[in-house]
């Protein structure tokens, strides 16, 4: 993502409260500081203008109309003795209205609030760092129990209040007067920690380097213990070791990114720019508003109520304050992720609110639909089909897609070769599909790679480069071996094709992204170009053969019978008779017989093979031995045949196979020979 400031990436992460305030804080020319949203109101019901310090305040987020303040004045109407940069009356700056797309605000929370992504996510980063069960942390955050602060030289009164309710209730008559005294607020703030503030204190006290050292020591101790023989204990030990590794990785990541763990607890809540959560007025006095506005309103109302109670803390009951803190926590949770508390929050019409997580995540979220899924020039999309005649680095582009992608290059070459005089005539030739257009198109495509992408692009092999070739039809042809990298199959999957324009992009595609350069998985190093799905079915059909074996010949179930030897172009060909399976002296003879439809693809046959000591030295007992009049004998085994003379010398060996096996073997042999030649060139 490149903008005018040359920012090349967008990163989501934790930021400090000071950074959030710096994003939203704005100092007006008169020295007034604005940026904090304190009111839940949006627009005034009479004037339809944004409320001051509300969610659409023009002082905080900028003017609705460019150069016009909330009073309706412009820079030209400012008096000579006044500052021309903003309106003295309403405090709105005379700037472009596009500032409302990126100017943020903030809400100063009356109590700390945990970020629900880091508390309830899987895995829970807060529970991982603190090494505590998630249920106990949730009970602490939502006020189910408290824990005592480690205050020096001061007595501790409560420790895990939720675990000592029975003991406290027995002394209720003597404790109740103490809790109702005005000094209890001071005692509570000194001795008791609850809510997200307690989590923040524990995170702030962490030393990440000590966490890494202690976790490493514990992991080594568990590793040295080995297996105990108790399946349950061994399983617990394995889970603990995995947890320690994740904890060390998380702490190391915090150190490397200069992020403090306590930033996972919010003190300031950012407010999105108003253009990203608009309110639209339709005909008939209908108002359509973003759900995020309603969720922000709920947070502000509950936060203001809590701030009011804290100001009157001497009169407000402690349970009421804790209940209000819980409501603020739940309101922020709903804003960030409405389904974090189980059932999603609904409005008065039983409609589920869309939280920030719902706006961001998924196929229709902000990233995949708006930022990553935008339509771009020099691209196309079509269904993929198998291209069995293609090389690994090739893809077949339909004529319709190819001429659209390379149209500008074809026009340039038409004018350069003086086939046309201007662009208009060149476009007419392309429209009329003249023969010279296809010739130039093939020349242009010969040295220009294309990029194929299948969504979702989950790893690096989701987009690869190919050399395009023209094919008939309207589908993109793809070599079946590259399907595993794309996680694609040929049941209707679609792929997008992109054209790299600059020389740098073309060089990167050739050197890094070509399919024959990505034969191994970048994650684990295993081969990624392996036969799958359609190829496996094709190889199975090619090599299935006859399952009845050699004994089928005795019952003539194959329909293959003895052959008479004929001299066909000086080659040893055998025609079928009605007794025996055919014999061939080479694979070329067998392929010739198949082309002449003398044999079938899976018909059993005998193929003369080179003398193999593994076959000769086999201790297998022959099924049958046949002798001829001149002393020649034939030893018939399950899968091969040995021909010898009367001196017991082996003259030839025949193996029992099918034409499918022969074709498969020839392909593998040619591939190995080609690899050997390429390897010898590199030495």
Curated annotation (Swiss-Prot):
Its cofactor is Mg(2+); Zn(2+). It catalyses: RNA(n) + a ribonucleoside 5'-triphosphate = RNA(n+1) + diphosphate. Keywords: Chloroplast, DNA-directed RNA polymerase, Magnesium, Metal-binding, Nucleotidyltransferase, Plastid, Transcription, Transferase, Zinc. PANTHER family: DNA-DIRECTED RNA POLYMERASE, DNA-DIRECTED RNA POLYMERASE SUBUNIT BETA. InterPro entries: DNA-dir_RpoC_beta_prime, RNA_pol_asu, RNA_pol_N, RNA_pol_Rpb1_1, RNA_pol_Rpb1_3_sf, RNA_pol_Rpb1_clamp_domain, RNApol_RpoC1. Mg(2+) binds at residues 489, 491, 493. HAMAP family: RNApol_bact_RpoC1. The gene is rpoC1. GO terms for molecular function: DNA binding; DNA-directed RNA polymerase activity; magnesium ion binding; zinc ion binding. GO terms for cellular component: chloroplast; DNA-directed RNA polymerase complex; mitochondrion. SUPFAM superfamilies: beta and beta-prime subunits of DNA dependent RNA-polymerase. This is DNA-directed RNA polymerase subunit beta'. Its main location: plastid. In plastids the minimal PEP RNA polymerase catalytic core is composed of four subunits: alpha, beta, beta', and beta''. When a (nuclear-encoded) sigma factor is associated with the core the holoenzyme is formed, which can initiate transcription. Its EC number is 2.7.7.6. Binds 1 Mg(2+) ion per subunit. GO terms for biological process: DNA-templated transcription. It is found in: Plastid, Chloroplast.
């Amino acid at each position: 993502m490149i903008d005018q400031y040359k920012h090349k990436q967008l990163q989501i992460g934790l930021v400090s409260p000071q950074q959030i305030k710096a994003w939203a804080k704005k100092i007006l020319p008169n020295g007034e500081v604005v940026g904090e949203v304190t009111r839940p109101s949006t627009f005034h019901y009479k004037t339809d203008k944004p409320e001051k310090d509300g969610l659409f305040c023009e002082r905080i987020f900028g003017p609705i109309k460019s150069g016009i303040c909330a009073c309706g004045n412009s820079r030209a109407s400012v008096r000579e003795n006044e500052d021309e940069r903003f309106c003295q009356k309403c405090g709105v700056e005379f700037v472009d209205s596009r500032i409302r797309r990126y100017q943020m605000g903030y809400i100063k929370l009356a109590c700390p609030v945990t970020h629900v992504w880091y508390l309830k996510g899987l895995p829970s980063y807060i529970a991982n760092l603190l090494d505590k069960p998630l249920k106990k942390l949730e009970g602490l955050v939502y006020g189910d129990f408290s824990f005592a602060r480690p205050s020096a030289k001061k007595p501790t009164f409560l420790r895990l209040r939720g675990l000592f309710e029975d003991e406290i209730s027995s002394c209720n008559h003597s404790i109740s007067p103490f809790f109702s005294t005005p000094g209890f607020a001071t005692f509570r703030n000194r001795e008791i920690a609850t809510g997200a503030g307690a989590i923040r204190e524990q995170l702030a006290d962490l030393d990440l380097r000590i966490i890494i050292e202690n976790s490493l020591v514990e992991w080594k101790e568990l590793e040295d213990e080995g297996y105990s023989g108790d399946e349950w204990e061994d399983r617990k030990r394995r889970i603990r070791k995995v947890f320690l590794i994740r904890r060390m990785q998380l702490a190391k990541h915090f150190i490397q990114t200069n992020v403090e763990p306590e930033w996972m607890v919010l003190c300031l809540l950012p407010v999105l720019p108003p253009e990203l959560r608009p309110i639209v007025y339709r005909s008939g006095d209908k108002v359509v508003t973003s759900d995020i506005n309603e969720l922000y309103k709920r947070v502000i109302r509950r936060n203001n109520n809590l701030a009011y109670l804290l100001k009157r803390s001497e009169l407000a009951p402690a349970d009421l304050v804790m209940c209000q803190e819980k409501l603020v926590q739940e309101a922020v949770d709903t804003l960030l992720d409405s389904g974090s508390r189980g059932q999603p929050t609904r409005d008065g019409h039983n409609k589920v609110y869309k939280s920030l997580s719902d706006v961001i995540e998924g196929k229709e979220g902000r990233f995949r639909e708006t930022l990553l899924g935008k339509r771009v020039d020099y691209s196309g999309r079509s269904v993929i089909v198998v291209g069995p005649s293609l090389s690994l680095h090739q893809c077949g582009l339909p004529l319709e897609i190819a001429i659209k992608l390379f149209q500008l290059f074809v026009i340039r070459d038409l004018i350069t070769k003086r086939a046309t005089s201007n662009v208009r005539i060149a476009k007419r030739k392309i429209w009329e599909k003249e023969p010279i257009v296809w010739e130039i198109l093939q020349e242009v495509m010969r040295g220009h790679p294309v990029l194929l992408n299948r969504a979702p692009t989950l790893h690096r092999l989701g987009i690869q480069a190919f050399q395009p070739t023209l094919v008939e039809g309207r589908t993109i042809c793809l070599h079946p071996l590259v399907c595993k990298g794309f996680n694609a199959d040929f049941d209707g999957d679609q792929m997008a094709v992109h054209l790299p324009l600059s020389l740098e992009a073309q060089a990167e595609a050739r050197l890094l992204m070509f399919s024959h350069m990505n034969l191994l998985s970048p994650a684990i190093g295993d081969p990624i170009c392996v036969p799958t799905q359609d190829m496996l079915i094709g190889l199975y059909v090619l090599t299935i053969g006859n399952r009845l074996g050699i004994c089928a010949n005795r019952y003539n179930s194959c329909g293959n019978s003895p052959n008479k030897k004929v001299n066909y172009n000086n080659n040893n060909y055998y025609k079928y008779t009605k007794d025996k399976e055919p014999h061939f002296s080479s694979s070329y003879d067998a392929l010739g017989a198949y082309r002449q439809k003398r044999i079938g693809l899976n018909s059993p046959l005998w193929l003369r093979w080179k003398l193999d000591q593994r076959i000769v030295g086999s201790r297998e007992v022959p099924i049958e031995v046949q002798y001829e009049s001149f002393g020649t004998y034939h030893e018939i085994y399950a899968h091969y045949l040995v021909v010898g003379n009367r001196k017991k010398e082996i003259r030839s060996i025949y193996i029992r196979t099918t034409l499918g096996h022969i074709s498969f073997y020839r392909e593998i042999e040619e591939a190995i020979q080609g690899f050997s030649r390429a390897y010898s060139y590199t030495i």
